[in-house]
C-alpha cells in the first residue's frame, strides 16, 4: 500500500451526532406568537429569517443593517463572545465564509425597522444601557422561551431537613402557578441553533441551490450544507418514488 487507509482514525468511541429536525411552519407560527412583545422576539426573528449564528446576532450593529437598500440585507462583519461573563465584540469571525451579505425578507425588514426606531444603541440586540448582552443576560432573555415550554421540569425542596426531588410536567395551554401571565404554549424544543437550522432547511425546501445556501449560511465546509440538503431532499418516501422507480425500471422476471 502506498498510503495508510487507517491514518487519522481514532479508536475512541463516542456518541453519534444527534440529528435535529427543523421547526415546522406551524411551530414557527406558534413560537412567534409566543414571544411577540417579549425580549427574545428580535433574536428569534433574526435567527429564523437571516440564519445568523448566536455570536453573529449578538454582535450585529445597525451600521451592518441596510433596510433602505434596493434589496435590504444584513452584513455579517462581527462576532460576539463571552469572557468572564463580559461581552467581547470582535471582527474575527468563525471562518472566512462567515463574512457574508444576507438579503432579508420583508417580515424581517419590518421587524428591524420597528426595532431601530425604538433603539438608542448601536447594537441591534442590546441591554438597557445599550451594550451588547453578556452570557448571563442572553440566558435570561432565552429563559422567556424556556419557561413557556411544556418540557418536564425537576426541582428540589427541603422537607424536614431532607432534599426532596419533585417532577412537574406542564400541560399545553396551562398557566404557570406562580405567574398566571405565563402560558405553556410550546410543546416542542427550541434552541438558538434550531432557529438557524430552520432557516437553512426552509431555503433548501424552497429550491435554493445548495451552493447559494452554503454562502448564505456561512458554511465553510460544503459537507455541512449537503448533509442538511440530503435530509431535506430524501426525508419523505413519496419524494423518492420516481428515483427508486427509475433505478429499478427493469421488469421483474415472472
Regions found by a protein language model. Name each.
Residues 7-8, 71-76, 125, 191, ...:
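Short functional hotspots where side chains directly engage DNA or cofactors
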Residues 8-13, 26-27, 60-115:
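Conserved tyrosine-mediated DNA breakage-rejoining catalytic core shared by Y-recombinases
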Residues 10, 24, 32, 77, ...:
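Residue-level detector of conserved, well-ordered beta-strand and adjacent loop positions
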Residues 30-34, 85-90, 206, 227, ...:
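DNA/chromatin major-groove-contacting recognition/catalytic segments
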Amino acid at each position: 500500500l502506498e498510503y495508510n487507509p487507517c491514518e487519522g482514525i481514532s479508536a475512541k468511541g463516542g456518541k453519534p451526532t444527534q440529528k435535529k429536525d427543523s421547526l415546522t411552519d406551524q411551530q414557527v407560527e406558534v413560537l412567534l406568537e409566543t414571544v411577540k412583545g417579549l425580549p427574545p422576539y428580535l433574536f428569534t426573528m433574526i435567527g429564523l429569517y437571516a440564519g445568523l449564528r448566536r455570536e453573529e446576532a449578538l454582535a450585529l450593529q445597525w451600521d451592518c443593517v441596510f433596510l433602505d437598500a434596493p434589496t435590504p440585507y444584513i452584513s455579517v462583519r462581527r462576532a460576539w463572545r463571552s469572557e468572564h461573563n463580559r461581552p467581547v465584540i470582535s471582527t474575527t469571525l468563525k471562518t472566512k465564509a462567515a463574512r457574508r451579505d444576507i438579503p432579508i425578507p420583508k417580515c424581517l425588514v419590518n421587524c428591524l425597522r420597528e426595532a431601530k426606531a425604538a433603539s438608542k444603541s448601536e447594537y441591534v440586540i442590546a441591554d438597557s444601557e445599550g451594550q451588547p448582552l453578556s452570557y448571563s443576560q442572553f440566558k435570561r432573555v432565552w429563559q422567556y422561551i424556556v419557561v413557556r415550554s411544556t418540557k418536564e421540569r425537576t426541582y428540589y425542596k427541603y422537607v424536614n431537613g431532607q432534599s426532596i426531588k419533585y417532577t412537574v410536567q406542564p400541560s399545553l395551554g396551562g398557566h404557570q402557578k406562580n405567574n398566571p401571565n405565563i402560558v405553556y404554549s410550546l410543546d416542542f424544543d427550541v434552541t438558538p441553533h434550531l432557529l438557524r437550522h430552520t432557516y437553512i432547511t426552509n431555503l433548501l425546501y424552497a429550491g435554493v441551490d445548495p451552493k447559494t445556501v452554503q454562502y448564505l449560511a456561512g458554511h465553510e465546509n460544503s459537507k455541512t450544507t449537503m448533509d442538511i440538503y440530503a435530509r431535506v431532499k430524501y426525508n419523505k418516501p413519496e419524494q423518492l418514488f420516481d428515483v427508486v422507480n427509475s433505478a429499478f425500471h427493469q421488469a421483474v422476471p415472472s
